[in-house]
């Protein structure tokens, strides 16, 4: 009998109950007991969903009040010492302070969970870190499930992955030195689970899918030799990529089973079957835990039947990874197009699919004939639907030539024409795009969406906001202006709503971090632009000023990365379709008199595959998509792009290949350290290193920004430098925004004056600046939350 199980379930609730309970607790409107009660209700509901579908075990320990890595850090007792907390007496208030900071300490660093759009809290380790245990919440959850008569299978992030994802602020400290102490902490956890009669524990080790150095591979041997003595059977789970190259070594570990991701890496099945010990189970992730499309159940059954014949009861079935990454249920999607809805499966529906697969294997296809027929119908509907494949899009895509991704002239020639056309001063000042989204702006958009105000009144209100933004920028003395984006709820949904091939859910929320949830749009078919999206707004904004007004667009890779993407064609193909749609908008903006056009790509690095061997292929099509979107304009039109919170050094050749005339980046928190890579690489185009951190309400002084600009000039010649904040300003208030921008303009003018006094437009390149004293860049490798898709 094949067993069925899941690796984890979304914790937010189908109506985002956890989010609202968290935020009420933070406001002081709910007690800790009330928050705990909401959490317990959600856990029971989610376990019951699994039990009702006949799953052999229910996942426990996958719940977290904020983040599973933070909860494991608390369970181990490895809290950052700077907070001065007693792990054994940790309260929920203190737990949340670790994630959100307090008056004395900033929050723990947050970054992306592998290549997903979920963020985790990064453990802070050093030689003094101990793993003596913390609150008993993890065990209490297992007790809750056992008390309900359920077969609990607790879920733990494995010790090697935990160390891999941690960091140390002590230079040269080897995190692996902590492995022996860490394993003692894990053994105590497993001992307590064994004492409760737990048969199986799921140990997640997605790090096994990465490029690991020998010392880290050796750590797996050490870790599982130690944990074997603890008692419960261990299911070692990998996901997000192939672990086939480590299959032989992993199979020798003293564990009782393995989980592999056959959605992301179906080719690894043969290697794992060949390596699997005779005693071990093999859990196959055959339902996509990261996307929302229904599974082709017959195709999966064709894959599973030979495996079942070989393994018998040692075959387990599961989604590819935790269902954390998909919405909870389709039940509340009452307005979603009926045909599109029939193609989708959220977490609850994926439980149904898993149940069907298990019953088909363990009984017969006849028992689930109706469900298999429905699956067949959904697949046939997608293949035949006229909304999916658009001949004119396919024809246009086929006609794309390599030369279409190239500007007419090289940068050295373009920039001279742009300088002549734009007549900007040395060190031109600008912002990244958005201005404060006031309550009045949000209310206007909501009223229009509800039909409470008409299109004309909505347009008048938005134009009034644009006029305010333009006046404020002129008064501040900025050189290149923006319209402020008052009409945009976010940088992906706004464009997706105007592109064919996109769909939108009402309740398709997914946790990004803590209480922050995102509702990604759905790319279901060929993408094209039926009409201009931003041209009228940009034209109006430009009419209010003589200064250059930037057109503001989201790039094709960010549109792709922050959506649920169709799975019936390569992502590269969808990216090219998006690029052509954006290209049309870029050309129309130019025709409307917009001389500076920004195409934001904060998610470019997020798309990198986990294995470096796969990077070149991704970067090739991603960079080509950007170039295709940007290259239809004349030399005089200046193309900007923006990237934030990223480590660029290992992909600088690809960034240079994008050939944007100006790139703006986040650098203020790292005291311009990030810029050094651009200098060492001799980045050829213009660059705007952010001179102040928009994520902080603190208004930086003129002197502080001057120091950052001085440092920037040591790396990049001043004639190629722009002056700008780190990111968009939508999350800030107007008072702090105006004060910070006024200081920024003053800093730029002061440096211009100093350069002018020397009669110089160049700056002698000094030796590398001393190491920064600023905190390390958070979200390394990821877009910042100010650039994230619409969240709530």
UniProtKB/Swiss-Prot annotation:
Give the Enzyme Commission number.
2.1.1.14
Q: A Gene Ontology molecular-function term? A: 5-methyltetrahydropteroyltriglutamate-homocysteine S-methyltransferase activity
Give GO terms for biological process. Answer: methionine biosynthetic process; methylation
* Record keywords: Amino-acid biosynthesis, Metal-binding, Methionine biosynthesis, Methyltransferase, Repeat, Transferase, Zinc
Q: Which reaction does it catalyse?
A: 5-methyltetrahydropteroyltri-L-glutamate + L-homocysteine = tetrahydropteroyltri-L-glutamate + L-methionine
- Positions bound to 5-methyltetrahydropteroyltri-L-glutamate: 16-19, 112, 516-517, 562, 606
Known function: Catalyzes the transfer of a methyl group from 5-methyltetrahydrofolate to homocysteine resulting in methionine formation.
- Please give the Pfam families that the UniProt record associates with this protein: Meth_synt_1, Meth_synt_2
Q: Which Gene3D superfamilies match?
A: 3.20.20.210
The pathway this protein participates in, as annotated, is: Amino-acid biosynthesis; L-methionine biosynthesis via de novo pathway; L-methionine from L-homocysteine (MetE route): step 1/1
Similarity comment: family membership: Belongs to the vitamin-B12 independent methionine synthase family.
Q: Where does L-methionine bind?
A: 432-434, 485, 600
Cysteine disulfide links = none
Q: Which gene encodes it?
A: metE
Q: What is this protein called?
A: 5-methyltetrahydropteroyltriglutamate--homocysteine methyltransferase
């Amino acid at each position: 009998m094949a067993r069925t199980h899941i690796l984890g379930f979304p914790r937010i609730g189908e109506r985002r109950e956890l989010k609202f309970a968290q935020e009420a607790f933070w406001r002081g409107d709910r007690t800790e007991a009330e928050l705990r009660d909401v959490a317990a209700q959600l856990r029971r509901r989610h376990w019951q969903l699994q039990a009702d579908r006949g799953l052999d075990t229910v996942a426990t320990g996958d719940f977290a009040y904020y983040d599973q890595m933070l909860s494991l850090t608390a369970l181990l007792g490895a809290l950052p010492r700077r907070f001065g907390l007693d792990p054994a007496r940790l309260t929920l208030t203190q737990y949340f302070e670790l994630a959100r900071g307090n008056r004395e300490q900033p929050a723990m660093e947050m970054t992306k969970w592998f290549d997903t759009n979920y963020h985790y809290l990064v453990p802070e380790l050093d030689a003094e870190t101990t793993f003596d245990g913390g609150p008993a919440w993890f065990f209490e959850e297992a007790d809750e499930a056992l008390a309900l008569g359920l077969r609990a299978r607790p879920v733990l992030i494995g010790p090697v992955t935990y160390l891999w994802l941690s960091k140390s602020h002590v230079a040269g400290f080897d995190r692996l030195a902590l492995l022996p102490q860490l394993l003692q902490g894990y053994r105590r956890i497993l001992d307590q689970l064994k004492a409760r009669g737990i048969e199986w524990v799921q140990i997640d080790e997605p790090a096994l899918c990465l490029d690991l150095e020998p010392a880290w591979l050796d750590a797996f041997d050490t870790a599982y030799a130690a944990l074997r003595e603890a008692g419960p059977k261990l299911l070692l789970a990998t996901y997000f990529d192939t672990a086939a190259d480590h299959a032989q070594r992993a199979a020798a570990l003293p564990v009782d089973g393995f989980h592999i991701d056959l959605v992301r890496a179906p080719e690894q099945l043969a290697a794992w079957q060949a390596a699997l010990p005779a005693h071990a189970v093999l859990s196959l992730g055959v339902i996509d835990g990261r996307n929302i499309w229904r599974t082709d159940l017959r195709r999966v059954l064709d894959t599973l039947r030979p495996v079942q014949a070989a393994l018998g009861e040692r075959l387990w079935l599961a989604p590819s990874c935790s269902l954390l990454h998909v919405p909870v249920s389709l039940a509340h999607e009452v307005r979603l197009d009926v045909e599109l809805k029939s193609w989708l499966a959220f977490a609850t529906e994926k439980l149904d699919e898993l149940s069907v697969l298990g019953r088909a294997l363990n009984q017969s296809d006849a028992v689930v004939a109706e469900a298999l027929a429905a699956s067949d119908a959904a697949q046939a509907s997608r293949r035949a639907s006229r909304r999916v494949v658009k001949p004119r899009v396919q024809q246009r895509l086929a006609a794309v030539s390599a030369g279409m991704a190239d500007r007419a002239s090289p940068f050295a020639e373009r920039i001279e024409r742009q300088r002549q056309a734009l007549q900007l001063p040395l060190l031109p000042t600008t912002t990244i795009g958005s201005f404060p989204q006031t309550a009045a702006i949000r209310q206007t958009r909501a009223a229009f969406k509800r039909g409470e105000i008409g299109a004309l009144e909505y347009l008048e209100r938005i134009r009034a906001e644009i006029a305010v933004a333009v006046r404020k920028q002129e008064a501040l003395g900025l050189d290149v202006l923006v319209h402020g984006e008052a009409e945009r709820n976010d940088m992906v949904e706004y464009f997706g709503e105007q592109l064919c091939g996109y769909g939108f859910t009402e309740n398709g929320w997914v946790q990004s971090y803590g209480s922050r949830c995102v509702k990604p749009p759905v790319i279901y078919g060929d993408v094209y632009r039926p009409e201009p999206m931003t041209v009228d707004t940009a034209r109006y904004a430009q009419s209010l000023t003589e200064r250059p007004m930037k057109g503001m667009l989201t790039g094709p890779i960010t549109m792709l990365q922050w959506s649920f993407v169709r799975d019936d064609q390569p992502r590269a193909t969808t990216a090219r379709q998006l690029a052509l749609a954006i290209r049309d908008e870029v050309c129309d903006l130019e025709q409307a008199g917009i001389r500076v056009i920004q195409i934001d790509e904060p998610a470019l690095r997020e798309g990198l595959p986990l294995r470096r061997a796969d990077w070149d292929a991704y970067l090739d099509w991603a960079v080509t998509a950007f170039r295709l979107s940007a290259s239809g304009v004349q030399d005089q039109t200046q193309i900007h792009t923006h990237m934030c919170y990223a480590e660029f050094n290992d992909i600088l050749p690809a960034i240079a290949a994008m050939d944007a005339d100006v790139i703006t980046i986040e650098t203020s928190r790292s005291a311009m350290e990030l810029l050094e890579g651009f200098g060492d690489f001799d980045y050829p185009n213009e660059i705007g290193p952010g001179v102040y951190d928009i994520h902080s309400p603190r208004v930086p002084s003129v002197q502080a920004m001057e120091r950052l600009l001085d440092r920037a000039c040591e790396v990049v010649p001043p004639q190629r430098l722009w002056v700008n904040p780190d990111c968009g300003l939508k999350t800030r208030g107007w008072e702090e925004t105006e004060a910070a921008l006024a200081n920024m303009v003053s800093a730029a003018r002061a440096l211009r004056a100093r350069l002018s006094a020397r009669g110089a437009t160049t700056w002698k390149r000094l030796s590398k600046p001393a190491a920064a004293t600023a905190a390390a860049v958070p979200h390394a490798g990821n877009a910042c939350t100010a650039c994230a898709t619409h969240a709530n």
